[in-house]
Amino acid sequence: MKKSTLINSEVSRLIATLGHTDEITICDAGLPIPDHVQRIDLALAHGIPGFLDTVRVILSESQIEGVIIAEEFATVSPVHHDALITELAQESGLTGKPIAINYVSHEDFKVRTSQSRAVVRTGECTPYANVILQAGVVF
C-alpha cells in the first residue's frame, strides 16, 4: 500500500505524469466538465470530499507554480477563497517557490478548463469553489 498522503490511484497517476505548466482543475460539484477532458469524480455526497481538503492533498504531492481562480470566488464565497489563498501561501512557504495567482471571469475559467489534463470533481457545494493548478518543477 502506498505510504504517502494521496492514495487515490487516478489522481496519483495524474500527478506523476504532469509536465511543467500542465494544468489540473479541482472543482465543486456543479462545474461543467468538457467531454474531452479526463474526469476524476471524487464526489460522494454534498460536501464530501470538500474542495479545500482535496486541494491540500493534491498540493502535498505536486509542485505548483501558478493558479487560476474565478474573480467571483472572492466576492461570493470569501471564506473559502481566503482559505485557499492561505493554503497557497503556506505551500509557497514550504517549497520556497512563489505561486502566481491569476484571476479571470467565471466564464473564462470554464473555457480554460478545456486545457486541463484532468478535472477533479469534489462534493463541494460552495459557489465558485474551483481552481486550476499549473504544474511547476521541483528543481
Curated annotation (Swiss-Prot):
The keyword Calcium does not apply. Pfam families: RbsD_FucU (PF05025). Catalyzes the interconversion of beta-pyran and beta-furan forms of D-ribose. It is an enzyme of class 5 (isomerase). One of its GO terms (biological process) is D-ribose catabolic process. One of its GO terms (cellular component) is cytosol. This is D-ribose pyranase. InterPro entries: D-ribose_pyranase, RbsD-like_sf, RbsD_FucU. It is found in: Cytoplasm. Homodecamer. Substrate binds at D28, H106, Y128, A129, N130. It catalyses: beta-D-ribopyranose = beta-D-ribofuranose. It comes from Vibrio campbellii (strain ATCC BAA-1116). Its EC number is 5.4.99.62.
